[in-house]
Amino acid sequence: MKLKLGDIAKIQTGLFANNFADGDIVYLQAKHFNEEGLLKYALHPDLNSNEIEQRHLLKKGDVLFAAKGTRNFAAVYQNKKQACVASTSFFVIRLIEKNILPEYLAWYLNHPNTQQLLKNQAIGTSMVSISKVVLQNLEIHIPDLKTQKNILHVTELWKKEKQLKLQIETLREQQIQNQ
């Protein structure tokens, strides 16, 4: 089944805010994520909650989509320890359909074919960006939940395989150099 993202999720832009040295809410920015869309390091709260509306606070399972610049990626918000809001670099995608896993949606948005499709529709010259309308109209292929879980499982195994191959190569290099 294929559905438009705008029909299965609420999409809102991230928040523009000025950082403080100390705060009680984390202001998530694209620089906090590595190439695979994973958080790089522990985050420091740098926004004051008195100035943030509740609707901007991220909820577990929200999908963040970095829509500005040349590096577009999707990541699922999992942080349960600290309150966070997304910066304007992101669209926050909150699923309203229960038949799609947030992790599957992030995988789908990160898939090379989807990335190419989105890049072809990006606007701007010096700072390219993907518009909310483009995201809303993006057709998402939605298999059943079991298939979604299988896709995610195979993807995790593939990532582990890549990591193990890299470790093996590093150990080989070390062994050759130490002889």
Question: What positions do the PLM features span?
Answer:
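Basic, amphipathic alpha-helical recognition segments used for DNA target recognition
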Residues: 5, 91-142
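Non-catalytic DNA-recognition/assembly elements of restriction-modification systems
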Residues: 1-17, 23, 137, 141-179
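Sequence-specific dsDNA recognition surfaces
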Residues: 4-17, 31-60
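A structural connector/turn signal
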Residues: 52-53, 80, 125
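Short, surface-exposed loop/turn microsegments at beta-strand edges and helix-strand junctions
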Residues: 19-25, 56-58, 76-88
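ATP-grasp fold ATP-binding core
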Residues: 28
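A short beta-sheet element
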Residues: 67-108
